[in-house]
Amino acid sequence: MKGSCLCGAIRYEAAALSSPISHCHCRTCQKAHSSAYATTARVLREHFRWTSGASLLRSFESSPGKLRHFCTVCGTQLIAERPEQAHIILRIPTLDEDPGVTPTMHIWTSHDQPWTTENGEIPKYPEWPTAS
């Protein structure tokens, strides 16, 4: 599987996911991704490689020992890691292709925000809604 940041300056390849895809609702992921949750999966280090733009990566230690790596051009967070672990944590939305599997769980839902809803009570649009 191939992936990249928003501007395309950084590209990577991941041979296979090594865990199910999950939606992480922890407060750190909410802040880091400006979102209600982050969609992630583990990839073994030997199954991941940067193919271009690695010199444009910077990291931020978001909690003790956990590094989040992002593009210095567009700001896209691509992976997180704890260097002592055998895997990295891939940000699934940065894939340029369908991974062929869907998320299997939501984690850290105790951190859900009161303004989020996934129960189908609000309208959904395939694109931007027309003005009414």
Locate each region found by the language model:
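A short Gly-Trp-Pro
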Residues: 1-132
